[in-house]
Amino acid sequence: MATNLKQVKRGFANLKRSGTQMYYETMGQGSPVVFIHQCWWNNFEYEGVLPLVAKEHTVYSPDSLGFGFSPAAPGWFEFTDFTDSFIDFMDDLGIAKASFVGQHSGSLVMADLASRYPERVDKLIFGGLAIYEDELRKSKAARRDMIGGNKMPYTKSLRPGDLIGLESGLLQRKEDGSHMVEYWLEQYRENSDSKFEYVQRATIANLLHYDKGGRDMINALLTYDLERVLPSITQPSLQLVGDRDCVKPPLFKTVKEAADMLSSKINKIKIVEGGGIMLFLDYAFECAEAINDFLRDPEAYEGTDSREVARAMKEYLVPDFDKLVFDDNNVYVV
């Protein structure tokens, strides 16, 4: 599975450390920009954005190991090994340094890249930089290991897990094929405002991913302490996120909290009204415009008004009425 773009060049990069290959698509001319998709999708996520950013840059859109047309990740992979695979990708294609755009898990890969390979990273555009509540992150990782998270299609029927990401028998194959409908329903619940075309492609991407086996990036990701890493990041950074994205309390810290942990002197936030998990598909023009404007001049980029950001950060994914905060910021004469 890949984008349906006709004008891209398609190929495979050789990854020296894992001995595998990584599928990618590229187009355009100019400074390199690498797009990293979220779990459990593949590079179709950026289909609408790539041609617009390629007007000013050479864009690269790979399928992470275990996704799309790339082979499964080795079973021994940790999260930082997934990051290393992108350095191997750059090495094989002769990319000395690049800017990066990523959504959700792709943003976490970018954070690790910027921290451990600062000389290879120019500018960063994070989509939904997700910091799990720490106890939840660790319990999810342990639960997935216990039920055989890398072999989800073969697991026994288990009880549902958390509100985000079911640690359950959802992904096991069933003789009546109903598991395929469950994949669809999961994607539709998460992206009910998006086009059926996108929901269908996300469903197919999930099926394709779990048919591969190998190390699952989301399992590896849950072992990664993002909060420990963020203060070491100094590159110019933009948080590009939809106001309907799932990266919100109480399961995650806010995007503003994540941004404040960075040591970047240029540190901006852009909120796309109406955007959710499928932000880059549903709002391709708005995302491409923000990406091009920020890459062109990070310091001059304005982003979203601080008051609008503050209001957006109050919204919870799951309301917690024990933590209500009331503010009166009106201006009074007397």
Language-model region placement:
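Conserved loop-alpha-helix segment in the C-terminal half of the alpha/beta-hydrolase fold
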Residues: P236-G275
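Flexible "cap/lid" loop of the alpha/beta hydrolase fold
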Residues: S115, K123-G169
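Short glycine-enriched nucleophile-adjacent loop
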Residues: S107-P118, L124
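Active-site loop/oxyanion-hole signature of alpha/beta-hydrolase fold enzymes
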Residues: Y60-S105, R116, F280, F285, ...
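Conserved alpha/beta-hydrolase catalytic His-Asp/Glu region
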Residues: E135-L136, P160-S232
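Catalytic active-site module of serine/aspartate enzymes centered on a nucleophile-bearing elbow/loop
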Residues: K265-Y332
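Conserved HGGG/HGGXW glycine-rich cap/lid loop of the alpha/beta-hydrolase fold
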Residues: T20-P71
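N-terminal cap/lid segment of alpha/beta-hydrolase-fold proteins
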Residues: A2-Q21
